[in-house]
């Protein structure tokens, strides 16, 4: 189940999804409020579809609310391996109250708790800082809980932590700049006007000539960025000046600065694989829309690759759920 970027939905549907994979009567989620009326427990009510099929759940920082109920419940019941990165941490139950003048008020009435008893809420709105911003639950208050069958350790106050963390590769500064300036978007639009059709979403790939066209397209475009090395060099200069060493190393500093100065065109080739992948996804969207973009992105997806690897490795998969994998 790919729940990355899934911001949630209906509580009942999250219970129904979990019910596909666990025995009837299995606890799925509970809610607890300041008044007893909001204390409820939800269990799997129907006969499951399959309680044995190996199951992997993909999550990230955009997985929230109902999607965290699904992933957290299946993790707590030792039914699925969770992969990706820490989820959003939205564990609040909210109720909408009508007000005058056709307006409404959304009121938090309870919190969600997964079967182990942990609350997935990450921000503590009852203790805000002086700027009125909610703080994360401090490490000192994070509590350990245990899964139902294997007695594995899971923790509250931080969303859902994956069993296998797959770190996201950060974009290069040049790619970030091109995104912020909508230059991928602009070229993809021009590409769509020039070519009536392309191959299927999973097979589409820019030719070297087409990538050269993109490089030429950027020649007169305004985009600026600094590299991480250049940022560190600026910090080094400040530190050296503060410590009164800069005059002694100024010649060496200037030589290093000249060596590290980025070259836009050179970086377009240095980070070609990354830039080409982003551009191809943008172009595919013009022809095959959102479903096509998803299909194309899965061709180079480290989280999906790790999930497939885990599902194929029965020993690894079972050891994770049994809590014996170290």
Where are these regions (language model features)?
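Structural recognition of the beta-strand scaffold that forms the well-ordered cores
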Residues: 2, 28-30, 54-59, 81-84, ...
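Terminal peptide-recognition signature
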Residues: 1, 21, 55, 74, ...
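Conserved functional hotspot residues or short segments at active or partner-binding sites
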Residues: 119-326
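Amphipathic alpha-helical transducer elements in NTP-driven molecular machines
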Residues: 11, 15, 64-71, 106, ...
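Bacterial peptidoglycan biogenesis and beta-lactam-recognition machinery
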Residues: 22-32, 65-66, 75-84
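Polar, glycine-rich mid-to-C-terminal structural blocks
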Residues: 66, 78-79, 83-85, 89-152, ...
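Gly/Ser/Thr-rich loop/hinge elements
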Residues: 9-62, 92-98, 113
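Short, glycine-/small-residue-enriched flexible loop/hinge segments at domain edges that mediate gating
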Residues: 1-9
């Amino acid at each position: 189940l790919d729940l990355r970027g899934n911001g949630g939905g209906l509580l009942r549907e999250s219970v129904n999804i979990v019910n596909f994979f666990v025995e009837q009567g299995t606890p799925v989620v509970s809610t607890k409020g300041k008044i007893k009326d909001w204390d409820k427990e939800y269990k799997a009510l129907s006969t499951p579809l399959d309680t044995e099929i190996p199951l992997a759940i993909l999550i990230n920082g955009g997985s929230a609310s109902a999607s965290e109920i699904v992933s957290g419940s299946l993790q707590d019941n030792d039914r699925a391996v969770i992969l990706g990165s820490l989820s959003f941490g939205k564990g609040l139950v909210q109720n909408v109250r009508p007000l005058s003048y056709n307006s409404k008020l959304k009121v938090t009435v309870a919190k969600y708790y997964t079967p182990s008893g942990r609350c997935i809420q990450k921000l503590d709105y009852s203790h805000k800082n002086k700027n009125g911003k909610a703080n994360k639950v401090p490490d000192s208050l994070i509590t350990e809980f245990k899964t139902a069958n294997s007695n594995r350790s899971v923790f509250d106050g931080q969303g859902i932590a994956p069993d296998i963390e797959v770190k996201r590769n950060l974009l290069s500064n040049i790619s970030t700049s091109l995104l912020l300036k909508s230059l991928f978007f602009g070229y993809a639009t021009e590409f769509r006007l020039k070519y009536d059709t392309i191959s299927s979403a999973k097979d589409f790939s820019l030719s070297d000539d087409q990538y050269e066209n993109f490089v030429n397209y950027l020649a007169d475009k305004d985009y600026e960025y600094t590299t991480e090395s250049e940022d560190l060099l600026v910090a080094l200069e400040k530190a050296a000046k503060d410590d009164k060493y800069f005059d002694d190393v100024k010649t060496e500093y200037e030589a290093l600065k000249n060596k590290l100065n980025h070259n836009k065109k050179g970086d377009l080739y240095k980070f070609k694989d990354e830039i080409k992948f982003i551009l191809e996804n943008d172009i595919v969207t013009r022809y095959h829309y959102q479903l096509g973009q998803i299909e194309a992105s899965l061709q180079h997806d480290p989280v999906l690759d790790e999930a497939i690897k885990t599902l194929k490795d029965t020993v690894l998969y079972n050891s994770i759920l049994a809590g014996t994998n170290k």
